[in-house]
Amino acid sequence: MASPGTPAVISYGHLLTGAVGEFLQAESMPGPEIARAVAELVVNLSRYREERVPLSPVVFITDDRSHLLTRIGGREIVPIGTGPQDPATIRKALKLCAPLASAEWFIFVEQVAETFHFGLFRGDDFVLSPTPIEVLRSIVNPSVHMVAVAQLAESVLELRGSQGNSRYVYLSGARTEMPPPLVLEKLVSAATQDVLPPSREDVRTIFRHAFLEMLHMSHGALVAVLPPTGQSGSHFVDGLLLDIPIDVADLIRHYHEVPNEDARAAVQAVAHLLQGMLAADGITVLRSDGRIAGYNAFVHHLPGPTLENSNHQIGGARQRTFAALSARVGQTLVAAFFYSQDGYADCRWVGDSAKP
């Protein structure tokens, strides 16, 4: 016990390590060393930077690197280094590998006896191909021992295992009742609800990739979804609204009909274009038939709540804009989406009222 006048120490480290250990136990990867190492990985990835540049690599931990190729779609492996099974090796692996782990490259850490072997492996960066962690989310295989750690947003992480277990880890004060990936699925559904099969799933894949990248933006984002017959200009007081909305489904259909490099490049490029629009200030405007209608848009705010004895509205500018958009959902909008700087996400969708 601390002596009188000596501050007691409060640390979340042992709580995090304990929770990670329980997750790994459920994944048949028990042991205090691996629990401490993965907890170190979670803490480091939550706000990882090199030379003040934020990085968000996805890290896979396994006891057999061949599973990276045979189970989750990896293409080739590049070994980088080794070290004892301790947090220092995890920090070293991130230092050496994180700057290289972008686009199609991912970090792996392999348990071999008493050591960690680490390096990089390559996936397929084509936007219609599932990423390794998307494949991992879809499998439940007791014979495979593999977990992934991914930063979804600053201080918000996902733990995902090959035996079907998952956790969302919040190291911030963000509200946790609806994790961002679940909110994004509502937005994906809203933006594709009027896309006809068989293109719908591919359009959903493109939008999902772009929206997940959006979570790494430090400034937040806003999205409005119009119905197929919606007139963009009547909703917004300013913004860059396209005369001819970009038909993502049409680009995908053309790629499947003529799967050449030009068609593939067009699909890849429209995904990058959407990511750029989401990174811009203002509202990104989509249509529920899978079309991109505009970006950098703004709306008049409807009258909202004010602080007592003040004329100032509650919440920041994006939150007030989201309130204005939400008031139009079910009338002139199909959905409205809001993502804040602290990792909180919300989506209002007409499809919510159709659920039992």
Q: Where in this protein do the model-derived segments appear?
A:
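Divalent-cation
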Residues: 1-356
